[in-house]
Amino acid sequence: IDALLITHTHSDHVSGLDDLRAFFFPDRVELPVHATERHGQDIVTRFPYLFEKKPDSPSYFVPPMEMREIAAGQQLQIGDIAIDVLHQDHGNTSSLGFLFNGCFGYSTDVVAMPDDVFDRLADVDLWIVEALRETPHQSHSHFQQTFEWIERVRPVRAVLTHLGLEANYETLAAICPANTEPGVDGLVFELE
């Protein structure tokens, strides 16, 4: 893991941060965590021991994470990957989407996006995009809306994510557009 990109700080997205300590503690290297100012502050408040060393901490303890502020509209570079940070409306809050090397988009926990975000995502090779459930929701995209977004973006391939408990794989797969499939645990893909 070279870095973490935080879309937002709802518990289903950040509660596992503590589990990453095991990967970084032995080598005492810091994992960069990229988040908006507000979401970064929330994470540091919830998990202070991941970012700050207390005076009474053992001498061998090195906080495993470093918070780095990002904002929608910004571009950052992690290794050889250029990442465009995208604004998303998540109902009563905002979330971030990401576009990697101009060919892979990631949009979850989103109910609306500005036109310029759709323009940035146009014709990507792969778009992982939220489709919570069949009926509309105040902060998440539903199946029909996501299908309309896919038609607008025209990705080579779309994978639905953040599926709700009532989303049945076979039923959803049967109504997906030709280039679209529901995501599954363990999904692996390669981009050139």
Where are the predicted features?
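Binuclear metal-ion centers of metallo-dependent hydrolases, dominated by the metallo-beta-lactamase
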Residues: 114-126, 131-192
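Ser/Thr-centric signal marking residues that sit
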Residues: 7, 107-108, 129, 161
